[in-house]
């Protein structure tokens, strides 16, 4: 099964579980969790079921395309369900079966790994899912997002697209993966991986990045004063990515690192609170009324 077919299979499966299929969010981020489709939608009582592929940029993990499984940019297939179904684990195992992985024939383990994202003020109970000794998925029940307690609880399933495809295709090097017939992962991503690694470690203008962080932070705060959650959150994402670029260059000290993370977290918490209040003023329109109908 090539990677393109694998993604389509996951999309079809989770669509059958009433998840809407979204496109990736167009601002740089380090993980699918940071998309507003997860971060903001996990806030408040409104139900939400969605899936999407999210390119995830982690500058410090770049290896110029020379490492078989560490990348500047990888992909995650993200599934979020609120409230979390009682049978979410069974649903997940069912998705593996659709990919040709019979849970009865493989060693599948849920290894406790509680999750935290200090930049966004998020935390939850979590497990890594190991398939025959390889981690392929992160499974999380959100307890807190943006400093707010989650009720109802949102479940998040994050498939590592490249890792899962490597297992299915029995490839040791991610660049050897077949994306679709006749086209490899290397054909599509190798040049970008090399150049982005060189940028992250060698050529980025750190003075400019320091200025950009401050500029993005001010703009996020300014948009919050206007009550504009989504524009403000876009700039928080830009702050996060800019910080990651600075961190990759090694120009941020241990003390400064904590300070930068704190600045991002403070903005994220303000945004979470404002988003909750804005939905509350609307009467939480996606909450079902008695009889199963939604507010329109």
Swiss-Prot record:
Give the superkingdom in one word: Bacteria
One Gene Ontology term of the biological-process aspect is: glycyl-tRNA aminoacylation
User: Does the entry feature the keyword Transmembrane, yes or no?
Assistant: no
One cellular component (GO) term of this entry: cytosol
Q: Which UniProt keywords apply?
A: Aminoacyl-tRNA synthetase, ATP-binding, Cytoplasm, Ligase, Nucleotide-binding, Protein biosynthesis
Give the EC number(s) under which this enzyme is classified: 6.1.1.14
Q: Which SUPFAM superfamilies match?
A: Class II aaRS and biotin synthetases
Query: InterPro entries from the xrefs?
Result: aa-tRNA-synth_II/BPL/LPL, Gly-tRNA-synth_heterodimer, Gly-tRNA_ligase_asu
PANTHER family per the record?
GLYCINE--TRNA LIGASE, CHLOROPLASTIC_MITOCHONDRIAL 2 (PTHR30075:SF2), GLYCYL-TRNA SYNTHETASE (PTHR30075)
NCBIfam families hit by this protein: glyQ, PRK09348.1
Q: Which family does it belong to?
A: Belongs to the class-II aminoacyl-tRNA synthetase family.
Tell me what this protein is called.
Glycine--tRNA ligase alpha subunit
Which species expresses this protein natively? Listeria innocua serovar 6a (strain ATCC BAA-680 / CLIP 11262)
